[in-house]
Structures are given as C-alpha cells and as structure tokens.
Swiss-Prot record:
It comes from the Bacteria. Pathway: Purine metabolism; AMP biosynthesis via de novo pathway; AMP from IMP: step 1/2. This is Adenylosuccinate synthetase. PROSITE patterns: ADENYLOSUCCIN_SYN_1, ADENYLOSUCCIN_SYN_2.
C-alpha cells in the first residue's frame, strides 16, 4: 500500500477539513504530518461545527488518528480540543496516537512568539502568537522537547529549556507572567499522558505492509511553505507533499495519490504578497458570501480572483495527481469570473512563479462568463450549467490535472465526485 496525501495549494484555508471528512471512509489511518495549532480544519458533524487544530480530521469516522513527528503540539490547546470532542467522539484515547518524536510547544514559546513579533515593529509577518515558530526554532537548533521526553527526566529537561527562554525574554526586555500559563500547561501534560505515545514511523510503515490504507493530512497551504512560499510571510514548517515523508517517516516511493485542494478564488490571512487581492466591493462580496474569516483567529481573510500562476507552481511542487475545488458556489451570482493567467513584472509577461512578489507584480487576467446559477442543491455533475463546465475545463487545461471533486457548500452532501 501507499500513502495518499491531502494538502492545500494556496495560502491555507482551502477547506481541507471537509474534504478529509469526505475521503476518510476509504482509509484506515489519518495522519497529520506538519504544523501546529495555528491552523484550524473546520468540519460539520451531527449538525455541529468543529475546528480541529492538532487532531486529524478522521476522528469523527472512528479511524486511527496519528499526530506525526512533524507536528508541534501545544498540550493546553490539545487538551481543550479533546474536551470539545468528548460529546461527539467516544473513546478518544483509543483513536488518537501521538508520535514520540513530535515536539512540544512550551508555555514560554508563546511568550517568545509575541516578543519576537513585537520587536519587528512595522515588519510584522502576522503570526498567530501560538508559539509555533519558536518551537520549530528549538527543534532545528536541537534544543526542543519531544513527546517522548515526558517519560525520561522530563522535569530536568523542561527546567533547562524554560531557563533558556527566560534569558531570551529578559534580553528583549519583554514583560510577562508565566505562572498561570505554566500551571495550565502542566495540567495539560497529564492529559497527554492518557494517550498512546508511539513510534509513529514504525507504526505507519508496518500498517502499509499489512495492507492498511493511510491518508496524510497537511495543514495550511503550499504558498505558506517555509522554502517554497512567499518568504518571509510564511509558516515555520514545510507544507508541501515532500513533508509527508519527513513528517511521518515514510519513503518517497511510498507516496501514492496527491490530492491538491484549492478554492475557486483566492484568500489569504495576515500580511504578505497577494497579487490578485481585491480591495473593492468584489473582494468584500467574496468575503461575505464565502464567510471568509479565520477559523482560529477570526481575522477577516483577504480575497481575490484565482491565481493560476501560483496554482500551477503548487501543482508542480507537490506532484498533484487529482485536484479538488472548494467553494465553487461562492461565485454563483457573478456575471463574470476572472482568472490570473500570468504576471506583468516591469513591463514583461511572466508565467512562472517568481523568486519574490513585490509591488511591481501585476496580474494579467482572462475573463470567463459566470454561470449565474444556485448550485448548492446540485447532486450530479450532469446538472452543472454549461458556463461552470467551461470554467472547470479551462482550469484543468491550465493546470494539467483533472478536477476530481467539486464542493458546492459546507455540508458533506454538497460534494460532487466526478467520473
């Protein structure tokens, strides 16, 4: 068996949570391979909305859910997340496994995150302040604490890390009150101890050999990747397909289908370049119809037309085999729909994604006829209006990959799987 990978192709918030919920019946194991609690996957289950930050989205389907070694885990937020799930998901401790190699977000990581961002002044990158960046910094500098450390001289390692962080905070002259946060953090560690802490790399590889199916679930989006995104306005981890290998411990040869998710338009939260951003009534219309507000931060998302330059790049980097288009229904009322097919940079046409996106980058659009049809009740692709079929064909020809799934609303039933 091979691992299927599901990831976002834009700046995050593509709708991965719903798609995982749709796909999980086919899989035995769902595994998160990177990121932290700065991104939320929104799912509807039993008429209730849930936002999952660290727990894989297969939890509602009774699957084995693995938090992989590439994830950074905040015990406080993990505890809170499990508490919101107890009414809908029984026996959580039997469904969620945590990699011993996953790194912990310490209470001082949150403080450092805020302190670093404050120091940047006008050059802020829009961090969520959840401590993800400092946790990954400790990881690569070989100073981090891992889940497995809970069972080995943990208090000594913890005290050493906290003392080092306090010194950094002192150097930045940052005022803080650690005690309440630390007290809550230590209570939350006791909750983590109830869950199975495993060598997830061995577990997943043995599962594949045994014929079990695995879906690797990414967080955020390709254009936020620390290497291939719009640096420095990116997240602190690799969000692309290759990260499923390093974040779960599986070989590249064991990667199978790569499902790439994108919206029928574009959104972005926080600072950073966004070539197709619309700061007019059209952008506001997209935001209102699409309810474009961060699932965790509640920040209004910046909205714009679909960017095929960035999307082609994301498809290439990830080796996408099947595309999934979300929120098609948001465009139902538009007379015309635009798509960015290239950039103009200093008077020159550019079809490849550039090293840096500055103010000189201007989108070059093509305009398509809108379908002007309420598609939220459609049950089959045969019911798609012709203009929407033309839009799908245009996207497939532009991206070189077929669109397998089309989402027409937030509910699981509003999902069309194409032949």
């Amino acid at each position: 068996m091979k691992v299927s990978v599901l990831l976002g192709l834009q700046w995050g918030d593509e709708g991965k949570g719903k798609v995982v919920d749709v796909l999980t019946p086919k899989y035995d194991i769902v595994a998160r391979f990177q990121g932290g609690p700065n991104a939320g996957h929104t799912l509807l289950f039993a008429d209730r909305k849930y936002v999952l930050c660290s727990i894989p989205s297969g939890v509602f389907q009774g699957k084995v859910n693995i938090i992989g070694n590439g994830v950074v885990l905040d015990p406080i937020l993990f505890k809170a997340e499990t508490e919101t799930l107890t009414s809908s998901c029984s026996n959580l401790v039997d469904k969620i496994y945590i990699s011993r190699k996953a790194h912990l977000i310490l209470p001082t990581h949150r403080l450092l995150d805020v302190a670093y961002e404050t120091q940047k002044g006008n050059n802020k990158i829009g961090t969520t302040g959840k401590g993800i960046g400092p946790a990954y910094t400790d990881k690569v500098s070989r100073n981090g604490l891992r889940i497995g450390d809970i069972d080995y001289n943990f208090e000594e390692k913890y005290r050493y890390a906290i003392a080092r962080h306090k010194e950094l905070l002192h150097q930045m002259n940052f005022q803080y009150d650690l005690l309440p946060l630390e007290r809550e953090w230590k209570k939350s560690i006791e909750v983590i101890k109830r869950f199975k802490r495993i060598n997830s790399d061995n577990f997943i590889n043995k599962a594949l050999i045994g014929g079990r199916t695995v879906l690797a679930e990414g967080a955020q989006g390709t254009m936020l990747d620390v290497d291939f995104g719009s640096y420095p306005f990116v997240t602190s981890s690799n969000t692309i397909c290759a990260s499923a290998c390093t974040g779960l411990g599986v070989a590249p040869a064991k990667i199978g289908d790569v499902f790439g998710i994108f919206k029928a338009y574009c959104t972005r939260v926080g600072s950073g370049p966004f070539p197709t951003e619309l700061s007019d009534e059209i952008g506001e219309k997209l935001r209102n119809i699409g309810n474009e507000y961060g699932s965790i931060t509640k920040r209004p998302r910046r909205c714009g037309w679909i960017d095929l330059v960035a999307l082609r790049y994301a498809v290439m980097i990830n080796g996408v085999t099947q595309l999934i288009m979300m929120k098609s229904d948001v465009l139902d009322t538009f007379d015309t729909v635009k798509a960015c097919i290239a950039y103009e940079v200093n008077g020159q046409k550019m079809e490849d994604f550039p090293f840096e996106i500055g103010s000189s980058v201007k989108p070059i659009y093509t305009e398509l006829v809108g379908w002007k049809t309420n598609m939220t009740k459609i049950k089959s692709e045969n019911e798609f209006p012709k203009a929407f079929k033309d839009y799908l064909l245009f996207l497939e020809e532009s991206l070189g990959v077929s669109i397998k799934i089309v989402s027409l609303g937030p509910d699981r039933e509003q999902t069309i799987i194409r032949e």
